[in-house]
């Protein structure tokens, strides 16, 4: 894309300025060429409805132009907005079932990625009348409000501050269960947790699992997972045994909050798929077993000025 188009996108990310259709067409063409070079055949508006997961609908780049010819096409209109059936997604009671129309709209602050053969474009998801039907829309509004309020305060101490960014690092704790054993438990397969059964023969009383040597089979899973994450731009950093038996943790390098949330949503999907390759079932439920620690997702967050000051870092005289 041209330098002017690149600057327009960066201004949209940094300052919330609007992107006109001419620039959107350039961005879409660049995305298409890049994605096709990575083996992509389809694109999707990747969003986070109120289901606790992600959603996507794949459309092919393929588009007929005459009776006997076709091209690979992806326009600015297709990038910026898509229409989706919103009637079958949870909405918190804010709309009627017959109000089916919903819209996904491009979030330029979260980079697109190629997952398999699909170009995934992070988007918000809203109703025809503008209500948020996802988790990203209220997050973006909250980040904007925090930026405005925190910048006003920070400028009392440093007139050079023009923006305050919320950063986030999500600790992803999880249990790994052998697939052969998990499939014998309907409660695990249906609910992702145990609902009946006897206490385990060994718990966490000796604290010998926490930060212990990682079992070789689990380590092979972690290595495979990290490779997949790096290909998708997820900056994984730390891996270790957690407190409970067969409980582990993966932590990324912290980043801008909106992007960190998107990466964590993608991470959980990747973890499930890689677990299948290693004959594991991964459990994310907060309390899958009685009598031992559950899994948390600690949100380590802070506020950072555009002058490089971490506002939550303790001073020499806290």
Task: Outline where the language-model segments fall.
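Glycine-rich, acidic/polar active-site loops that bind/position phosphate-bearing ligands
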Residues: 102-318
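Histidine/acidic residue-rich metal-binding segments in metalloenzymes
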Residues: 1-76, 80-98
